Amino acid sequence: MNDILTLDKISLSYQTEKDEIRALESISFSVDEGEFVAIIGPSGCGKTSILSIIAGLLKPSGGEITIKGKPLEKGKTSIGYMLQKDELFPWRTIMENTYLPLEVKRDKSEKSKEKVNELLKKYGLWEFRKKHPRQLSGGMRQRAALIRTMASSPDLLLLDEPFSALDYQTRLTVCDDLYEIIRRENKTTVLVTHDISEALSTADRIIVLSKRPSKILNIHLIDLNKEVSPLKRREDPRFSKWFERLWRELNYEK
């Protein structure tokens, strides 16, 4: 398989009034095309910082990131970044919100708009396209947020705890919905989550981080069936064994 993303010895430090804080230390991993990778770790260990560095929003103190073999700043790969909250503009309709990346790119082509329209139709939001975010459920807003993230046809999706703002039952349903969209569209994805079950139910590989300064403790290849839904993966007898293994790794770090 071809590497879409490679992080090589990424480190991050920042200065406070008192001293220098080391957040990340020698983080190295790669993500293959079409792969779904989850990153888990203790609270405050720098998971979101890793996504921000990949997205080019935060400059690392050391190390190198390459996208399709080229340095991040020189690459032409499109990256979609979905935050914890849906961040839909309340004054815009669902359709207008999903068109936003096209507007940013000044892409006025009917072909691009039609592609977004097809996503809205395929994933059950077409009849709600003229509604405003407040008129939709939390799950539907998250679906709209993912479609907006994919509107510019990104090569790489970054998901920063996209289900954390939802109640447990809605979270399971939305996780299934978003997973189906990502797999159908064959999107290369990096998910950050504090939820072990969420990571296990979606990822091909799981990267386990230590407490700060964060290092990689382990990278696990998850042998659960990726052709079934996240909810079905949770029913696999191996799921609980994986959960216990990962929980012990994280608990050891506390």
Give the ranges of each region predicted by the language model:
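The feature captures the beta-strand-to-loop junction immediately N-terminal to the Walker
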Residues: 40-42
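Helix-to-loop junction immediately C-terminal to a conserved catalytic motif
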Residues: 55
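Conserved ABC transporter NBD signature motif
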Residues: 63-75
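Short helical segment in ABC ATPase nucleotide-binding domains corresponding to the A-loop/adjacent helical element
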Residues: 95-103, 113
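Conserved ABC ATPase "signature" region
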Residues: 110-128, 180
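Conserved ABC ATPase signature
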Residues: 132-136, 140
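A short, proline-enriched helix->beta-strand linker immediately N-terminal to the Walker B motif
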Residues: 151-155
